[in-house]
Amino acid sequence: MTDILLGIDFGTGGCKVTVIDSLGNILAAASGEYPSAHPYPGWSEQAPADWWRVMNTVLAELRQRPEWPGWRVAALAMDSYTHGAVLLDEHLQVIRPTIIWTDQRSAPECQALDPKTRDDIFRIGYQMPTPTWTLP
């Protein structure tokens, strides 16, 4: 049985999964894409269900490899693109698509902030208010 590290990366446009051995050798890799919706100019959203679906499809593809039965997942590393709030209801069900970092709909609000408010936001969150970043 070969111990492996399974790395799962959720990027802006897709999910990549890499299988690495204890020496750092890449044994296998697979990826799949998911869509972004742009219902209005400047908007950019994704359905969390698409992330889950694509990840499972990519993992299923890797499990079809003939060497898979000889691998034991010893560690799992996961990462994602910057940030995105997944809003849930009281039953932990997703209630709307996730607004992703490329969304620019809040540009007018960011531009309308007075200098003191902008400075306060920076002092508290160490970032300037821009449409790209969620406030802390």
What is each stretch, according to the model?
Residues K16-V19, R53-N56, M78:
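A generic N-terminal leader/anchor concept
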Residues L5, F10-P48, Q93-W101:
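Short glycine-rich, Thr/Ser-proximal phosphate-binding strand/loop in the N-terminal lobe
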